[in-house]
């Protein structure tokens, strides 16, 4: 393969990768918004001193 052919193949790979990655970025933005909404609901709920994280579970009751 000549240098021109290798450069052309390189450009095709870069352009294909760029075009394929754009739709997946826009799809993940919608999922991120939904996840943020769910997370805000968790923070608004009353915990009453409960912690469900394994590191602090021995000090606080999880309530599950």
Swiss-Prot record:
Expressed by the venom duct. It comes from the Eukaryota. Residues 1-21 form the signal peptide. Residues 22-49 form a propeptide. Its main location: secreted. One of its GO terms (molecular function) is acetylcholine receptor inhibitor activity. Coiled coil: none annotated. The cysteine framework is I (CC-C-C). Alpha3/5 pattern. Found in injectable (milked) (IV) venom. This is Alpha-conotoxin CnIL. It comes from Conus consors.
